[in-house]
Amino acid sequence: MVQTKTLTYNSPIEGDVVVTRLDAAINWMRKNSLWPMPMGLACCAIELMASACARFDISRFGAEVMRFSPRQCDVMIVAGTVTYKMAYSVKRIYEQMPDPKWVISMGACASSGGMYRSYSVLQGIDQLIPVDVYVSGCPPRPEALLDALIKLQEKIDKEASLRRLKQSAA
């Protein structure tokens, strides 16, 4: 009878080192290649368009490719007033986006209803979908949107992306 010994290395950090490195690589790729989808619903959309001009250079943050198809984007920028009639469409578009997905609420109207406090206006998009970054202002300047992209990149950098991939695969 032949006995076989298996050599093992018992380390408290075994497995975590590789996962951490892979997480960092995945998060680096995600944060530097954001594909935003503009939901320009009011005057904030003009400032959103201005942020794509050469003066502000949104391409520095890897977000220059604006997609108008929810299946090809990972960041939704809700810019402007959201009415209850429009809310169903916004939620449906959000659900069509592939995971991982993030939302930027741009402007006072998208964040809190703004000056339109009426029966037909949703008082904040966060009542409908989860929001990751808020941009204040009426309308906010393009620099504020660029700052929101930086904040979103910092948030993406801290996520445990590989663990989330394993959970969604199970």
From Swiss-Prot:
Main location: membrane
Pfam families on file: Oxidored_q6
Keywords tagged on the record: 4Fe-4S, Cell inner membrane, Cell membrane, Iron, Iron-sulfur, Membrane, Metal-binding, NAD, Quinone, Translocase, Transport, Ubiquinone
Gene3D superfamilies on file: 3.40.50.12280
GO biological process, one term: aerobic respiration
GO molecular function, one term: quinone binding
Recorded topology in the membrane: Peripheral membrane protein
One CC-aspect GO term: plasma membrane
Cofactor binding notes: Binds 1 [4Fe-4S] cluster.
Cofactor: [4Fe-4S] cluster
Locations listed in the record: Cell inner membrane
Catalysed reactions, semicolon-separated: a quinone + NADH + 5 H(+)(in) = a quinol + NAD(+) + 4 H(+)(out)
Residues at which [4Fe-4S] cluster binds: 43-44, 109, 138
Keyword flag Transferase: no
This enzyme's EC code(s): 7.1.1.-
UniProt function note: NDH-1 shuttles electrons from NADH, via FMN and iron-sulfur (Fe-S) centers, to quinones in the respiratory chain. The immediate electron acceptor for the enzyme in this species is believed to be ubiquinone. Couples the redox reaction to proton translocation (for every two electrons transferred, four hydrogen ions are translocated across the cytoplasmic membrane), and thus conserves the redox energy in a proton gradient.
Complex and partners: NDH-1 is composed of 14 different subunits. Subunits NuoB, C, D, E, F, and G constitute the peripheral sector of the complex.
Entry similarity comment: Belongs to the complex I 20 kDa subunit family.
UniProt-recorded name of the protein: NADH-quinone oxidoreductase subunit B
Species whose genome carries this gene: Methylacidiphilum infernorum (isolate V4) (Methylokorus infernorum (strain V4))
